[in-house]
């Protein structure tokens, strides 16, 4: 008969959700589980396939075709910009960081909007930017959106929550994934997409967010602080409940401003962003190999 080798199969595990669907944070010990794979193995990243992992929009949300895989054989142009960097705190707790450097430094690289579907997953937060010559007027504040798959985003635009093609949303020409900038615990991707789809079609008088960033961040984190009027009246919080925005300037200088609500802090941060000009510092070319 001879010896017969058993065929070894590999089981694929979807990512374990670490977010509380209720959006309520609890002070408790969390245990993380990490899986390490050899670089010699072909690791096919399937997280961008919403049907396989149940990331589907509820009724009323247009069906999202399967997102393109992250592994595509084409050239991605990665841009590094000269832009204002921020960090934000509530009391002593860091709640937002758009600062490079350090072990948890933010990646501020941007890509052409045509390249974003290859690096996005449903539920991702996107920041869309406008690059323009220095001779023109300053660009508007960065536009935020929730990626729902198939090159589609849901966003608050011109007083309406709508679903648009990524290439048409705000007519931006570059963008990036900004999931890690806010330090709150995220909801699972399916709930992020449901939050966004569940508000499609709302108009100004029905909307409780004052800008695209607050709406997109609420979809991902479920924090009422992102809503207009979602916190106690100004001036009644103790210092440990107030917000502080740090603007990181050149030569390691930092300007700090205090706010009574997250809504006010975000408004000021976006005002500073809109008043500056984005200038390309460095252009990198990254080849992404097709591993399929």
From Swiss-Prot:
Source organism superkingdom: Eukaryota
Keyword Repeat tagged: no
Entry-linked Gene3D superfamilies: endopeptidase domain like (from Nostoc punctiforme)
Keywords for the protein's UniProt record, in alphabetical order: Cytoplasm, Phosphoprotein
PROSITE patterns: LRAT (PS51934)
Sites of Phosphoserine modification: 38
Function: May play a role in cell morphology and motility.
PANTHER family reported in the protein's UniProt record: PROTEIN FAM84B-RELATED, PROTEIN LRATD1
Entry protein name: Protein LRATD1
Organism encoding this protein: Mus musculus (Mouse)
């Amino acid at each position: 008969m001879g010896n017969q080798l058993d065929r070894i199969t590999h089981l694929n595990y979807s990512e374990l959700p670490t977010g509380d669907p209720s959006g309520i944070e609890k002070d408790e010990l969390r245990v993380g589980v990490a899986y390490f794979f050899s670089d010699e193995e072909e690791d096919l990243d399937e997280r961008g396939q919403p049907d396989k992992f149940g990331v589907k929009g509820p009724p009323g949300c247009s069906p999202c075709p399967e997102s393109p895989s992250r592994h595509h054989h084409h050239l991605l142009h990665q841009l590094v910009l000269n832009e204002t960097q921020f960090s934000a705190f509530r009391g002593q707790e860091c709640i937002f960081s758009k600062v490079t450097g350090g072990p948890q430094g933010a990646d501020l690289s941007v890509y052409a909007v045509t390249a974003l579907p290859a690096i996005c997953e449903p539920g991702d937060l996107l920041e869309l930017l406008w690059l323009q010559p220095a001779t023109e007027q300053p660009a508007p504040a960065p536009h935020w959106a929730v990626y729902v798959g198939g090159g589609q985003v849901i966003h608050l635009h011109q007083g309406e929550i709508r679903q648009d093609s990524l290439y048409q949303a705000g007519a931006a020409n570059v963008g990036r994934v900004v999931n890690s900038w806010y330090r709150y615990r995220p909801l699972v991707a399916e709930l992020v997409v449901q939050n966004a789809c569940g508000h499609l079609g709302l108009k100004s008088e029905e909307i409780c967010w004052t800008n695209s960033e607050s709406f997109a961040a609420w979809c991902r984190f479920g924090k009422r602080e992102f809503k207009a009027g979602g916190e106690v009246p100004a001036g009644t919080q103790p210092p440990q409940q107030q917000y502080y925005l740090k603007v990181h300037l050149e030569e390691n200088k930092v300007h700090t401003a205090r706010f009574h609500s997250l809504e006010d802090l975000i408004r000021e941060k976006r005002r500073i962003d809109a008043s500056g000009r984005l200038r390309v510092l460095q252009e990198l070319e990254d080849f992404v190999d097709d591993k399929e």
